[in-house]
């Protein structure tokens, strides 16, 4: 018997997935169904690009709906209060600097479904997060890089 994959995420992340799911079901799915019906009215489906395009989009949307349902159903909501205030954990925001003297950087550590490095959210599965998790303010950690080298960082601040 296979175990379902658990998707760790914040309550905010789950809410965003739920909103996307609702949009797909209530807005996008009916729009695509309508486009398919209109395209069918054009006759021969074998050379009907509007029909093929709508069917392709329908397949994508239905697949995304199934994926979102599974992710929401198997969501493990992260409680940043479950660990000490100064300990890095999922759902917390950590400020660190690369040693010896780089500028501080701040990222929230979130589940992989929510990661968006450009928005300051890194996946708990990333090398940086793995190195920082369960460490405390003042700790210095080594973060492996894809090149095989590593960088040293110091944790400056942890926030919920």
Curated annotation (Swiss-Prot):
PROSITE patterns: GREAB_1. GO terms for molecular function: DNA binding; RNA polymerase binding. InterPro entries: GreA/GreB_C_sf, TF_GreA/GreB_CS, Tscrpt_elong_fac_GreA, Tscrpt_elong_fac_GreA/B, Tscrpt_elong_fac_GreA/B_C, Tscrpt_elong_fac_GreA/B_fam, Tscrpt_elong_fac_GreA/B_N, Tscrpt_elong_fac_GreA/B_N_sf. GO terms for biological process: DNA-templated transcription elongation; regulation of DNA-templated transcription elongation. It holds the Pfam family GreA_GreB_N. Necessary for efficient RNA polymerase transcription elongation past template-encoded arresting sites. The arresting sites in DNA have the property of trapping a certain fraction of elongating RNA polymerases that pass through, resulting in locked ternary complexes. Cleavage of the nascent transcript by cleavage factors such as GreA or GreB allows the resumption of elongation from the new 3'terminus. GreA releases sequences of 2 to 3 nucleotides. This is Transcription elongation factor GreA. The lineage of its organism: Bacteria, Bacillati, Bacillota, Bacilli, Lactobacillales. The gene is greA.
């Amino acid at each position: 018997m296979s175990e379902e994959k658990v998707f760790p995420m914040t309550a905010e992340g789950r809410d965003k997935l739920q909103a996307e799911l609702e949009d797909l079901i209530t807005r996008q799915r009916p729009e695509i169904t309508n486009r398919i019906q209109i395209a069918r009215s054009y006759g021969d489906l074998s050379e009907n690009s509007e029909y093929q395009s709508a069917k392709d989009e329908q397949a994508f949307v239905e697949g995304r709906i199934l994926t979102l349902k599974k992710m929401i159903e198997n969501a493990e909501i992260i409680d940043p209060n479950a660990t000490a205030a100064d300990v890095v954990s999922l759902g917390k925001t950590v400020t660190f600097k690369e040693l010896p003297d780089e500028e501080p950087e701040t990222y929230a550590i979130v589940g992989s479904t929510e990661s968006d490095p450009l928005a300051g959210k890194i996946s708990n599965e990333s090398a940086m997060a793995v190195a920082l998790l369960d460490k405390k303010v003042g700790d210095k950690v080594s973060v492996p890089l894809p090149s095989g080298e590593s960088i040293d960082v110091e944790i400056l601040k942890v926030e919920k």
